[in-house]
Amino acid sequence: MRGPLIVLVALAVLAWLSWEVMQRRAPQEIPASAAPDSAGSGVRAVRLYFASPNGDSLVAETRELVEPATFHDRVATLVAELDRGPRGRGVAALPAGTAVLHVYMDDRGLLTLDVSGAFRRGFHGGSTAEYLAIASLVRTLGANLPEVRRVLIVCAGRPLATLGGHLPLDRPLEVSDWP
């Protein structure tokens, strides 16, 4: 008699736990009208640049994103969105898996951007693909971070002479040169 009672209690507990789990939903995507987050930043529109479908230029895409609290997180969020690729027309220009490791910003507008090794390892293209990858990154950062005037790209903590052999990356890139 004791065995069936234990099974019945166990089933009741399991049913209660299942009901509790079902009541807690996964977080929903934040609507554009969301209230500010705990840092007071809220949601803002960002402009991302992707390769055009025919691969000869960049196309802009606007997204509503939660504004991160720190500068590092703002940069990391922009790069992560580029890595996710476009929602509309266009093609991701960054090598897949590119992520921000570190960000250094000086008082003269120089952003030193340390990206993961996937940036270099994942690149398999020619001069146009290289241009589009760098332009996508620099234009997106410049469009959304007005304090950034120049970008120096570093890969996994080491200087990067070039991505694909065509564009020099061993010196800072002027944002204004990538309109």
Please provide the spans of the model-predicted regions:
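Bimodal "functional hotspot" detector
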Residues: 1-179
